[in-house]
Swiss-Prot record:
Source species: Mesomycoplasma hyopneumoniae (strain 232)
Source organism superkingdom: Bacteria
Gene Ontology molecular function: rRNA (uridine-N3-)-methyltransferase activity
NCBIfam families the UniProt entry points to: PRK11713.5-5, RsmE family RNA methyltransferase
Swiss-Prot/TrEMBL keywords: Cytoplasm, Methyltransferase, rRNA processing, S-adenosyl-L-methionine, Transferase
Gene that this sequence comes from: rsmE
Name under which the protein is recorded: Ribosomal RNA small subunit methyltransferase E
InterPro entries in alphabetical order: Alpha/beta_knot_MTases, RsmE, RsmE_MTase_dom, tRNA_m1G_MTases_N
Length: 227
């Protein structure tokens, strides 16, 4: 069953945006019921013919969000890899995504950053709809590595992936809010790791094999997110 996030409710109807209406037209929804997600809750609805409204049939109970908040701080990657990581992170259950620049980031974003952010937000939206999320994870404009560490220092669990780390993954059994930092293709240098460790980050290895950044993000998210 198709699902769409909506922001406006009038009495027993949701107001659908032109973007949502175009999607509904593309998938040829006419008489079939579908689901609207409004303020993190699910509603079974039907389209009102020749209008921009969906009539509410009933509210559906359900919470598909993880027990803990997990933030993915991901270094800027090549466009295809970065967008793939966003998509899969949302499907797995990430709460927020913080893009960042570090020393070895080779991919420099050019052009209109706000336009790129809009595209990332659309990926988050479509992935959240596809995976039946109650909310759309937030993704931010890129920040530098130093600012990232400062913003992340108060998380109860702070992990940074580093191929030369001696520690294996040790995730607490009880769900806790967590931030994980995944570096660029060139990894982190020793100074960057030391900066993170001074603020309480645990540097961890993901195993004997070197993973691509997008693969490392998926692997670590599946370990940290608690359903």
């Amino acid at each position: 069953m198709y699902r769409f996030f909506v922001n406006e409710k009038q009495e027993n109807f949701f107001i659908l945006t032109n973007l949502t209406l175009n999607h509904i037209k593309t998938v040829r929804i006419k008489n079939e019921n579908f689901i609207c997600v409004y303020q993190n809750e699910f509603y079974l609805v039907r389209l009102v013919p020749n209008s921009n409204k969906a009539e509410i049939i009933e509210k559906i109970k359900g919470n598909n969000e993880p027990k803990n908040k997990v933030v993915l701080a991901l270094a800027i990657l090549k466009t295809k890899s970065f967008e793939f990581a966003i998509q899969k992170a949302v499907e797995i259950g990430v709460n927020e995504i913080w893009p960042f620049y570090s020393k070895n980031v080779s991919q420099k974003l050019s052009g209109d950053l706000e336009k790129k952010l809009k595209r990332w937000e659309q990926i988050c939206l479509h992935s959240a709809q596809q995976s039946f999320r109650n909310l759309i994870p937030k993704i931010n404009l890129p920040i530098n590595y130093k600012d990232l560490l400062e913003q992340a220092k108060n998380f109860p669990v702070k992990l940074i992936s580093f191929e030369r780390a001696k520690n294996n993954i040790n995730i607490p059994d009880n769900p806790q809010n967590t931030i994980i930092i995944i570096g660029p293709e060139g990894g982190f240098d020793d100074v960057e790791i030391q900066q993170a460790e001074k603020l309480g980050f645990q540097s961890i290895t993901l195993g004997k094999r070197i993973l691509r950044s997008e693969t490392a993000a998926i692997f670590l998210l599946t370990k940290c997110i608690k359903d």
